[in-house]
């Protein structure tokens, strides 16, 4: 395999970065800000007016009362709302049904799922205590009323002097015919204005992947002179319909329009020996971000790791030399080591492509929006598990995150496998076993709200609610960290099954998808793009469109 000119350039960039960090004394010992020293950053976020995650109720959860699917003595529910919040049930719900689910209840994901799974467990972004309205489980008791109606109301939130606010909340909604979920706002005791509506006209009943394990971000205009706002979550359904769960509610000041030009990256993963689609994806990315400052390749670049496969990819990269950004940053995936040859041989082929001497490293993208740090993680030894990691790599990540947090910079982290309970598919339990240090890495990232983890491997649809997830952790920063599914250049997968214990993953179709990432001083904007498939070298199509986008504010920006 002949290294391309761009490969040589990225090797030089990595060496220059390492040299500059050594000179600054920042490799091996992260710079510590006042009172931080690499410890979890739990500073408040200036633009957040109100935050409610229901976790203050954790010590008040009651033992199982009536639910027939939960073992006696297991604790995990209460009807007592957080201070200032309230629940109002319809008049017909006072008697009958299962006590635990009489209107909006405050519970945990595990307790709720113990009642019955039926996709409840997929609410993986939930942190500790959540709010749940469940007409299905309520109907498992005698004398269940014909209708289910319940409203969760926020405490009055100060909005005086503001023209607009932004409401965000995590949401897990499964619809049914006749069922409705609504979010409204009322100012100073006035009439309610509808902000969000889920019903049979707006939701695919029984299963709508866009609304499971999702988040809602809703702009809200504030009338002149208004002082306080109350938000309400209304849920109505016939008996024995489905459910709605909510967590991590926040009301914040909207971001101002972005200022200046960004530093930009292309992101691709899971090419797996499809050089034609890779070449087409690079051309489509160049069409929409011709001045990109980096290409991030998030693993599974080849199908099994043979020399011929690497040569095919290198041929595509060489043919795209005039298009490629100056920096190409690669992470190792599981498909880089499937030929049956020794791990060291397969690893070294990847490292030859990546033009560095270890699987993990640090890069700086340099563009109009300034310098953007990129941290690369990866498998260091033969599996199992899928991602064995040395303590040196974990501690290096800890130090580098602390270093960039101290400078209030958003940092891009790329690693092929998702962490458990983050993006699409990772709610399936075996994804929590991919990393040797899954829980430690999750807690570590949760202390750094400026960190954004880009992961591939799952091939799941961008259309799902958990394509991009703000994942919070116990004891971490209240904003948690973001993680984004990179899609795939080769085939799409999805999950099938009602319960996690019997879940199946299947291939659904051929795809060609990736991301663009625009980094500004105070935010990162990620666009999930569809390039369409091709079946011959140098062939193109008319598909090059945005499927989803997410704007990730930098909570540490001044």
Language-model segments: which ranges?
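N-terminal active-site segment of His-dependent metallophosphoesterases
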Residues: 253-310
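Secretory targeting and sorting signals
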Residues: 1-34
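Beta-sandwich/jellyroll recognition modules and their flexible linkers
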Residues: 38-256
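Extended active-site neighborhood of metal-dependent phosphoesterases/phosphodiesterases
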Residues: 307-407, 436-441, 446-447, 460-520, ...
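Short acidic, glycine-rich surface-loop motifs adjacent to enzyme active sites
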Residues: 404-424
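Active-site-proximal beta-strand elements of phosphoester/diester hydrolases
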Residues: 262-272, 371-381, 412-416, 481-488, ...
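A short C-terminal boundary segment appended to hydrolase-like catalytic domains
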Residues: 258-259, 503-558
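Active-site neighborhood of phospho(di)ester-bond hydrolases with catalytic His/Asp-centered motifs
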Residues: 267-269, 295-300, 328-334, 413-415, ...
């Amino acid at each position: 395999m002949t290294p391309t000119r761009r490969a040589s350039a990225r090797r030089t960039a990595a060496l220059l970065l390492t040299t500059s960090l050594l000179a600054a004394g920042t490799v091996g010992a992260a710079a510590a800000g006042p009172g931080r020293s690499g410890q979890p950053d739990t500073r408040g976020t200036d633009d957040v007016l109100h935050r409610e995650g229901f976790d203050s109720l954790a010590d008040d959860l009651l033992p199982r009362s009536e639910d027939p699917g939960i073992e006696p003595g297991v604790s995990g529910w209460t009807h007592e709302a957080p201070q200032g919040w309230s629940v109002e049930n319809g008049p017909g719900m006072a008697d009958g049904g299962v006590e635990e689910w009489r209107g909006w209840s405050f519970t945990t994901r595990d307790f709720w799922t113990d009642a019955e799974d039926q996709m409840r467990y997929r609410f993986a972004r939930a942190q500790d205590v959540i709010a749940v309205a469940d007409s299905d489980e309520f109907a498992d008791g005698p004398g269940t009323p014909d209708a289910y109606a319940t409203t969760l109301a926020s405490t009055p939130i100060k909005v005086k002097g503001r023209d607009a606010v932004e409401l965000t909340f995590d949401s897990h909604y499964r619809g049914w015919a006749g069922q409705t979920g609504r979010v409204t706002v009322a100012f100073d005791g006035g009439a309610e204005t509808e902000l969000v509506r889920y019903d049979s006209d707006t939701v695919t009943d029984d299963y709508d992947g866009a609304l499971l394990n999702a988040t809602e971000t809703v702009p809200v205009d504030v009338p002149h002179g208004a002082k306080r706002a109350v938000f309400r979550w209304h849920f109505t359904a016939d008996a024995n319909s489905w459910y709605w769960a909510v967590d991590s509610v926040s009301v914040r000041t909207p971001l101002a329009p972005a200022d200046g030009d960004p530093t930009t990256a292309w992101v691709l993963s899971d090419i797996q020996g499809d050089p034609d689609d890779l070449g087409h994806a690079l051309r489509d990315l160049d069409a929409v971000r011709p001045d990109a400052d980096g290409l991030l390749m998030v693993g599974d670049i080849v199908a099994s790791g043979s020399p011929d496969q690497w040569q095919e990819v290198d041929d595509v990269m060489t043919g795209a030399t005039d298009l490629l950004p100056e920096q190409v940053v690669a992470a190792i995936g599981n498909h880089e080591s499937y030929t049956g040859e020794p791990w060291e041989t397969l690893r070294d082929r990847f490292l030859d492509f990546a033009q560095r001497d270890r699987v993990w490293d640090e890069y700086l993208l340099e563009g109009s929006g300034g310098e953007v740090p990129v941290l690369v993680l990866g498998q260091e030894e033969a599996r199992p598990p899928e991602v064995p990691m040395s303590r040196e790599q974990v501690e290096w990540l800890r130090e580098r995150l602390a270093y960039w947090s101290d400078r209030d910079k958003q940092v891009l982290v790329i690693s092929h496998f998702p962490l458990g309970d983050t993006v699409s598919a990772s709610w399936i339990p075996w994804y929590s076993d991919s990393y040797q240090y899954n829980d430690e890495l999750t807690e570590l990232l949760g202390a750094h709200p400026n960190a954004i983890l880009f992961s591939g491997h799952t091939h799941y649809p961008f259309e799902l609610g958990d394509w991009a997830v703000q994942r919070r952790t116990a004891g971490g920063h209240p904003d948690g960290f973001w993680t984004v599914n990179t899609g795939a250049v080769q085939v799409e997968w999805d999950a099938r099954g009602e319960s996690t214990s019997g879940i199946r993953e299947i291939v659904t179709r051929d795809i060609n998808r990736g991301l663009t990432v625009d980094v500004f001083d105070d935010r990162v904007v990620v666009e999930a793009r569809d390039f369409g498939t091709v079946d011959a070298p140098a062939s193109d199509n008319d598909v090059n469109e945005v499927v989803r986008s997410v704007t990730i504010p930098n909570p540490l920006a001044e």
